[in-house]
Amino acid sequence: KAVNLYCELKKVCPTLDSLDIGGGFPIQTYLDFEYDYEYMAEEIVSQIKLICNQNGVPEPHIFTEFGSYTVGESGAMLYSIVNQKKQNDRELWDMIDSSFMTTLPDTWAINQRYIFMAINNWDSEYERVNLGGLTCDSEDFYNAEVHSNAVFLPKMELGREQYIGFFHMGAYQES
């Protein structure tokens, strides 16, 4: 649609020479993510060329706004687990040394997913836990149901520190 509009405008404004196709390139949000970026870029360019050729219009300079794709991998948030508590006699909660609401707001605001993993104690036995932030707000938690159906971390041991990390969150988050 945008390319057709470009072709119409190019005919009335011959100096028009650029097209901004916006954003939308996906970013890796889980470890087994596979996406053929090269294919998609080639497909975008070939479709623009095809439509311009069909309309007898020179191909434009193409601009993109792939913000998350461009900078997403540049960011990571590391937290330490400061406490573990049991709720409802069955739910284990690991509490981080910060707040998801202030440092990773998109995890609770729009259920954004990020690559998440333990930083240390990988050789330990793992357990299913919920992750909570330090605020008293009931929304300050990592929604495991939305993100991965379960969060597994090394079992907590008295006197042993545990660190976790969220990765590829360089766009639009606090870092």
Where are these regions (language model features)?
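Charged (often Lys/Glu-rich) extended helix/loop segments that serve as interaction or gating elements
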Residues: E43, K49, N53, V57-S175
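Active-site-proximal beta-alpha core segment in soluble small-molecule metabolic enzymes
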Residues: K1-S18, I27, C52
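Glycine-rich beta-strand-to-loop/alpha-helix junction loops that act as flexible
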Residues: L19-Q28, T64-Y69
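Glycine-rich tight-turn/loop motif centered on a GG-T
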Residues: T29-E38
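Conserved N-terminal phosphate-binding loop of PLP-dependent enzymes in the Aspartate aminotransferase
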Residues: K1, D36, E59
